[in-house]
Amino acid sequence: MQFEPALQQGRLVKRYKRFLADIKLADGSEMTIHCPNTGSMRNCLFPGEAVWFSTSANPKRKYAYTWELMGTPNGGFIGIHSGSANALAEEAIHSGIIKELTGYDTLSREVKYGDENSRIDILLQGAQKPDCYIEVKSCTLLEDGQGFFPDAVSLRGQKHLRELMHMANLGHRAVLLFVVQHSEIFSVAPAAHIDHEYANLLKKATLSGVEVLAYRCEMSPTEIRLAQACPVRV
């Protein structure tokens, strides 16, 4: 996924009210940009470090700029736009990066499924193959060298695991895909210390036939894309 037009750079001052962040520009002026992340962003906020933001062509938007990347003290990157995970996954499936998800004929987004009024992120279908239901999650929490999900209690994430188990029990293929948008995360594990119920459900899901995959992103101020698989420690 190319960043077009090119991202602009500033320095983080603070994130607040969940969807807003103040940044400082090179000329010393400050401005407010949109923060497209509904999570806690635990361990992802580094005041004074570089941020990169995109510009919207929509003149009706209250905030014309959107936070895309956070620089880390170690020179790495964190993808802030959690909503881009689905698009990154779709792009990687089409390009054959995710080897486990090749060989299907069609890809659909936001299809109704399950028995809890849910919509699947990605549905793959192919001749003489079971339908493949894929839930995509963005992973950015790094603690003690380990990547974790979720970064806050996630009732929605718990529901999605139940739905995936339901689809697996019906004979479909069910996949949980972690899109790792932190350049210093090399493996993913359930955050039992944050959401114990999610961790328990994930173990049950794997025993029920749900596949769990994780792919790391390569990130720069010009591009972000899924690049390589990494271990998931359930």
Swiss-Prot record:
Cross-referenced CDD domains: SfsA-like_bacterial
Top-rank taxon: Bacteria
Pfam families registered for this protein in UniProt: SfsA, SfsA_N
GO MF, one annotated term: DNA binding
NCBIfam families: sfsA
PANTHER family with a match to the protein in the record: SUGAR FERMENTATION STIMULATION PROTEIN A
Family according to the record: Belongs to the SfsA family.
HAMAP family xref list: SfsA
Designated name of the protein: Sugar fermentation stimulation protein homolog
Organism: Shewanella sp. (strain W3-18-1)
Gene name linked to the record: sfsA
